[in-house]
């Protein structure tokens, strides 16, 4: 029964707090007589000043930490302290400066009445119909400003003043994968792949490096420095300045790798409503397979996949361009090869929008034998009226190469959109001497809303055999005279077609693609076609794919490959939460038919553990393969492992990935990170989860790294209140940050570490401390609360024993102060509350 009485008291305190803080709607001012709540000891005895509560939402004047909104749109990255004072009506009025109003989009220049000569606080009454609404219970300050008094800007534009360059820090991103394969009667194959991405942030500057290491027992060890660069944003130009290794944009010319400098537009700095690209790799594995992605001979990505369809959507930008070569190494040692086009195309620009790039430096080839010739390049794309876009550029490498490009794009309304451009080149290469030629390119895109059809056609035609790109020309200047065939062959025609057809909710969707290429110097050509169908039946998904590839070699010999695959996925949530079963079959010419059965799922509340088991009957070999895989996303990194076994072979894979962030407050370990990240600072709050990020939680000091943020956009970093410990309170669980590209932004949270204590305070005569008195931890006004009826007060963040300071009175010479020493004791039950009784004297 005692426990019941205790809970009722606690509930009454909460109800009392809610009554004081609840919003009220009325046609007349509400009033209550504070005398009804006063407890007098006799004539002349001091009483608690409750006059501030006589009006609706009444609160004492002073500093309040609030979220600030303008016209119900949040304009501050996080809560901030604002001084409130009483106006003539007895209501609280905020002190905001002219600079702050201007920062938040108010047209202060048109309203000189805002300025007050003897105060830094702006006079909101200087704008007709403007007013401030302080919602105490939500700690929200909303400034209602007429639209005519606001500066014009896009609805989704984030003011530059809110962009956060982040904190100084050292970074190290690492990813290591090891793979072992044992074949009956053959030597065991072992390989290890490691990539390291160290970095340094100081103010707006970002220093980055990408280094890889490969080792196998067959080919030895090899280190490669893929790139190093120094970068910063130039806000006034909405651009990025890059010094070091990178690649020129591919919107007008083919992308060219360089070591030097580049100034280029960064469209991410623009609002979404007025403004980029890395391909998604898709394929089908017949067994537990190792997927390796190479670009220009470098390994840029490696991972292990389970049998069936896979998708790689986290391929990092390598700072280079060129088609991606994808190798799928199956458990039986066989390999599949895919080629994924990797190039971006010019896009139509809004009227008046200009995008540019200026690049200069050494041609950065992907092997040590190519000479480092100097070149410069400039491109520009400008949006003209009536839906036209004009674009062009120049390239110059002295007497070795010059080219000029000019193109136009047009939005042709219901007919779609097209672009056409031409490049004229003059080249001096070591294999063919001086030549000149032209390249023409036409593209067309159209959405048929009535039929749900979207298709894009892109065609390249090298109209003369004398045309060469900058990379093809400078690539012939080599110390070994061994010019690669991809430079000497010179593509003549390349055509691409992609089509997506929505068949409606009841019938699924179709997609198709076609790529054709041929060359001037030999009979080599290729033709690839793909057709896919997808459909969901009440959460059961099916897919059917057909691909056809024909490659003709240097002397006309053709190889052809046909692959047909079918897959069905069935959720098993009724039996096992977050689990699904899959069956897939693949028929490939030359490899027969394989069948695969999989069971996959995730575990824990935040789905931080992914697991899978599978069984495969592989192709013509009729090898039976069984295996499994597991991946665990922890706060300090990610671990993964896989194992498969057949009659003649075994495969074992394992890996670890993560990042180390060294900052002014210490060292924080995390999962692998993206380009732009956040650092949670919640001092002393250990084990607090971060919403929407599996496995991320604060360390023993209260720090955690949020691995992915969007630059130049509002990002909410929200802590999971369900993971709060009984001895931890956090005032605000969500912070809003606006990072610049590559920044590490800090999201600070106000924490109170200690016990929640329900305390009964009495005076030496045994009477309770008066209702409405303010109680706080001695020498700390952070832990403060209002005393309720019977001298009871609920405080959080208290040590087990300490001293409270209690004040009451009307502030007119009748204020009473006393101190109360206490020792708290844990309550029975699972409420997490502690109790204490103390005499205030």
Question: Positions of the model-derived regions?
Answer:
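Post-signal-peptide, soluble extracytosolic/periplasmic N-terminal scaffold domains
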Residues: 2-5, 11-16, 26-277, 588-661
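Short, ordered, surface-exposed loop/turn motifs in non-cytosolic proteins
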Residues: 60-82, 684-693, 765-779
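A short, amphipathic beta-strand motif
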Residues: 68, 281-283, 678-682, 755-764
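Short Pro-Gly-centered beta-turn/loop motif in secreted/extracellular proteins
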Residues: 87-96, 315-321, 703-725, 729, ...
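Extracellular beta-sheet/turn segments enriched in Thr/Pro/Gly and aliphatic residues
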Residues: 140-144, 346-349, 733-754, 821-841
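Transmembrane beta-strands of outer-membrane beta-barrel pores
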Residues: 149, 178-182, 204, 213-217, ...
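Feature captures outer-membrane beta-barrel proteins of Gram-negative bacteria and organelles
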Residues: 163, 190-203, 224-237, 372-386, ...
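Short, acidic Ser/Thr/Gly-rich low-complexity loop/linker segments typical of extracellular
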Residues: 695-703, 780-792
């Amino acid at each position: 029964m005692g426990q019941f009485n205790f809970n009722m008291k606690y509930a009454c305190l909460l109800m009392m707090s809610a009554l004081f803080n609840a919003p009220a709607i009325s046609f007349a001012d509400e009033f209550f007589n504070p005398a009804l709540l006063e407890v007098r000891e006799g004539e002349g005895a001091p009483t608690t000043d409750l006059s501030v509560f006589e009006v609706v939402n009444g609160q004492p004047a002073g500093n309040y930490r609030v979220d600030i909104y303008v016209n119900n749109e949040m304009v501050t990255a996080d809560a901030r302290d604002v001084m409130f004072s009483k106006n003539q009506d007895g209501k609280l009025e905020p002190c905001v400066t002219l600079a702050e109003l201007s920062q938040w989009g108010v047209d202060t220049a048109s309203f000189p009445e805002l300025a007050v000569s003897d105060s830094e606080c702006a006079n909101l009454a200087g704008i007709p119909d403007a007013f401030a609404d302080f919602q105490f219970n939500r700690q929200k300050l909303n400034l209602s400003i007429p639209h005519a008094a606001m500066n014009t800007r896009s609805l989704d534009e984030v003011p530059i003043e809110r962009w956060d360059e982040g904190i100084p820090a050292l970074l190290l991103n690492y990813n290591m994968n090891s793979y072992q394969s044992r074949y009956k009667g053959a030597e065991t194959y072992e390989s290890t792949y490691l990539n390291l991405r160290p970095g340094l942030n100081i103010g707006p500057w970002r220093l980055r490096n990408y280094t890889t290491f490969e080792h196998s027992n067959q080919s030895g060890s090899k280190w490669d420095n893929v790139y190093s660069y120094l970068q910063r944003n130039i806000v006034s130009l909405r651009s990025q300045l890059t010094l070091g290794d990178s690649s020129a944009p591919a919107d007008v010319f083919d992308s060219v790798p360089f070591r030097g400098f580049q100034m280029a537009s960064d469209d991410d700095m623009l609002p979404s409503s007025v403004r980029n690209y890395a391909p998604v790799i898709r394929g089908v594995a017949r067994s537990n397979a190792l997927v390796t992605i190479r670009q220009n001979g470098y390994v840029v990505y490696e991972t292990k996949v389970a049998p069936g369809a896979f998708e790689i959507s986290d391929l990092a930008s390598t700072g280079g361009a060129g088609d991606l070569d994808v190798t799928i190494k199956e458990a039986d040692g066989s390999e599949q090869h895919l080629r994924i086009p990797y190039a971006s195309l010019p896009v139509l620009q809004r009227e008046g929008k200009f995008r540019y790039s200026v690049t200069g430096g050494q041609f950065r080839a992907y092997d040590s034998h190519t000479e480092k010739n100097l070149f410069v390049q400039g491109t520009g794309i400008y949006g003209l009226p009536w839906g036209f876009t004009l674009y062009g550029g120049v390239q110059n490498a002295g007497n070795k190469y010059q080219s000029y490009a000019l193109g136009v794009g047009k939005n042709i309304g219901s007919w779609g959109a097209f672009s056409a451009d031409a490049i004229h080149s003059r080249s001096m290469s070591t294999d063919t001497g001086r030549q000149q030629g032209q390249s023409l390119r036409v593209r067309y895109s159209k959405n048929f809303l009535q039929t749900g059809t979207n298709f894009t056609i892109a065609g390249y035609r090298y109209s003369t055999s004398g045309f060469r790109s900058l990379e093809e020309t400078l690539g012939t200047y080599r110390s070994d005279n061994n010019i690669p065939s991809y430079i000497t062959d010179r593509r003549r025609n390349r055509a691409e077609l992609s089509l997506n057809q929505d068949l409606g909710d009841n019938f699924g969707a179709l997609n198709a693609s076609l790529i054709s290429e041929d060359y001037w110097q030999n009979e080599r050509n290729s033709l690839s076609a793909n057709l896919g169908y997808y459909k969901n039946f009440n959460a059961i998904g099916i897919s059917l794919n057909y691909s056809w590839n024909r490659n003709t070699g240097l002397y006309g010999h053709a190889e052809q490959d046909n692959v047909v695959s079918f897959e069905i996925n069935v959720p098993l949530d009724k039996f096992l939460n977050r689990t699904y079963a899959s069956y897939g079959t693949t028929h490939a010419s030359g490899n027969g038919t394989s069948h695969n059965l999989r069971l996959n799922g995730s575990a824990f509340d935040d789905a931080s553990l992914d697991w899978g088991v599978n069984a495969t009957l592989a192709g013509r070999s009729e090898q039976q393969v069984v295996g499994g895989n597991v991946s665990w996303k922890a706060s300090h990194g990610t671990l993964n492992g896989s194992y498969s076994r057949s009659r003649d072979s075994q495969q074992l894979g394992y890996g670890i990935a993560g990042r180390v962030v060294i900052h002014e407050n210490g060292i924080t370990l995390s999962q692998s990170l993206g380009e732009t990240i956040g650092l949670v600072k919640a001092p002393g709050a250990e084990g607090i989860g971060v919403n929407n990020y599996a496995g991320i939680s604060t360390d023993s000091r209260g720090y955690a790294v949020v691995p992915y943020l969007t630059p130049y956009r509002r990002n909410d970093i929200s802590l999971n209140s369900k993971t709060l410990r009984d001895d931890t309170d956090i005032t605000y669980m969500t912070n809003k940050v606006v990072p610049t590209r590559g920044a590490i932004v800090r999201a600070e949270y106000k924490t109170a570490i200690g016990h929640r204590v329900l305390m009964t305070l009495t005076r030496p005569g045994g009477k309770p401390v008066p209702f409405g008195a303010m109680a706080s931890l001695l020498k700390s006004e952070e832990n403060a609360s209002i005393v309720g009826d019977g001298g009871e007060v609920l405080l959080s963040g208290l040590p087990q024993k300490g001293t409270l300071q209690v004040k009451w009175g009307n502030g007119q010479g009748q204020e009473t102060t006393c101190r109360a020493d206490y020792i708290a004791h844990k309550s029975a039950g699972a409420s997490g509350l502690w109790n204490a009784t103390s005499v205030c004297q």
